[in-house]
UniProtKB/Swiss-Prot annotation:
InterPro entries: PCMT, SAM-dependent_MTases_sf. Catalyzes the methyl esterification of L-isoaspartyl residues in peptides and proteins that result from spontaneous decomposition of normal L-aspartyl and L-asparaginyl residues. It plays a role in the repair and/or degradation of damaged proteins. Belongs to the methyltransferase superfamily. L-isoaspartyl/D-aspartyl protein methyltransferase family. Pfam families: PCMT. GO terms for cellular component: cytoplasm. SUPFAM superfamilies: S-adenosyl-L-methionine-dependent methyltransferases. Coiled coil: none annotated. GO terms for molecular function: protein-L-isoaspartate (D-aspartate) O-methyltransferase activity. Keywords: Cytoplasm, Methyltransferase, S-adenosyl-L-methionine, Transferase. This is Protein-L-isoaspartate O-methyltransferase. It comes from the Bacteria. Its EC number is 2.1.1.77. It is an enzyme of class 2 (transferase).
Length: 220
């Protein structure tokens, strides 16, 4: 009985979250459907699940966060508008929530995580949910070359510049969505591949954890 009551509460909270996303300007029906379907609280430790549907980032340990729902929805909307289907690479698996959203939307999802504890935790969660997300432990700034090219690449951490390895792994007309900037804030930036050239578009400012790796920031 308690589990059924909790399920209803979480379902109501998800609905409230989706309504808030609409008020914030998220209008894509596929994105909203995914956010209403994927149970965000399952990506939180049990002690913190009451915070899962709040509109804020939340620590998942190791200096990393699960991004606030609006940020995830914003990046997902940018992807689906430019790349409605295909093979997508996520840099920074973190909790696994973004990968689950992409999988629900029908993408073939590949994701890279550099922190072993988060890699193992997200693998367990995604596996328990029966999702066929392809995961690897490694330096996300180098992408996943063996599985390239990708129709889209989403980076869930802030970088000083777009890693050349990621640009090189885009398919023709593929898009790289990445926050670019410094520790004070990053502009959400989209790079679209046109042959050996990349069209650059800049959008709103966000605050992400740093992208650590050979082509990102150094670990302090």
């Amino acid at each position: 009985m308690a589990e059924q009551q909790d399920a209803r509460v979480y379902s109501d909270r998800r609905h409230e979250m989706v309504e808030q996303l609409k008020r914030y300007g998220i209008t894509n029906s596929k994105v909203l459907e995914a956010f209403n379907a994927v149970e965000r609280h399952l990506f939180f430790d049990a002690a913190y699940r009451d915070f899962a549907y709040d509109d804020g980032a939340f620590s998942i340990g190791y200096g990393q966060t699960i991004s606030q729902p609006y940020t995830v929805a914003y990046m997902t909307s940018m992807l689906v508008e430019r790349c409605p289907s295909g093979k997508v690479l996520e840099i920074g698996t973190g909790s696994g929530y973004q990968a689950a959203i992409l999988e629900y939307m029908g993408y073939s999802v590949y994701t890279v995580e550099r922190i072993e504890a988060l890699f193992r935790r997200s693998s367990l969660i995604l596996g328990a949910l029966g999702l066929t997300v392809h995961q690897i432990l490694g330096d996300g700034t180098l992408g996943w070359e063996e599985e390239a090219p990708y129709s889209g690449i989403i980076v869930t951490a802030g970088a000083p510049e777009p890693p050349s390895a990621l640009l090189g792994q885009l398919a023709e007309e593929g898009v790289l969505i990445i926050p670019i900037g410094d520790s004070t804030g990053q502009r959400m930036t989209v790079f679209t591949r046109r042959g050996e050239m990349f069209q650059r578009e800049e959008f709103h400012t966000f605050a992400f954890v740093p992208l650590i790796g050979r082509e990102g920031w150094r670990e302090e």
